[in-house]
Amino acid sequence: MTTAELTEMTELLVQYLQKNHFIQFDLKAVLFDMDGVLYDSMPAHDKSWQQTMDEMGLKHLPHEFYLQEGKIGQSTIDAVFQRNLHRDATDEEVKKIYARKTELFQQYNTGELIPGAIEILKYVQTKGLKPVLVTGSGQPSLLNRLEIHFPGVFTSETMVTAFDVQQGKPHPESYLRGLQKGGNLKPNQAIVIENAPLGTESAVGAGIFTIAVNTGPLPDSVLSEAGASIVFDSMGTLLETMPEIVRIIQTIRL
């Protein structure tokens, strides 16, 4: 990082501490979203949602499912139903639609990892920090792959999924649960790595310093407006910067 970039990063971290009334960080954990941060699965999610809604005769908006990323499935379905039919979906409709979406996702998902994801997780562990997964996903096919691709990194005790919360992102419940699973942490004892606006809102709402990585088609401004303190264009770029971010976090004090 250049001197100017280091200064800017320090200022962003100071602003976070001041806004949230902390004197310093006490970093213990890094909370990771899954889709779009660890796995390049969002194109498959988007395609399967679009096709499912098309088959149901329900209109959807450009990039709607990227913007809705992080919500639990029923909330995503209800948003489309409200706009098209002015009502929520019935339990039976939700079950049918989500089953079809899941079927299509399994066809389209390649299982590819986001470049840099493994390296960032390894770096986090070498620094003695705890990786915690915080995802709105309830897709068994993805959750089951975590142990294959990231052996020993995540356990049920360090994972928050759609099955663990009543209110999906952007409500802060997911990341508040992430703090609990990280060891009953305070917000200044963790940082978040997100890729989605709703996930960013959730993390910021939980009071955690939030880094966004824009791995999708949305403009950076959407993530900044959602509250991200800084936006990177890839996990690779974040990987290059991560040592300096951690160093500043561990030394800064108001």
Where are the regions a protein language model picked out?
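Metal-dependent phosphoesterase signature
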Residues: 15, 81-119, 127
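Short glycine/serine/threonine/alanine-rich loop segments
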Residues: 58, 129, 208
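Asp-based, Mg2+/Mn2+-dependent phosphohydrolase catalytic module
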Residues: 1-27, 122, 138-254
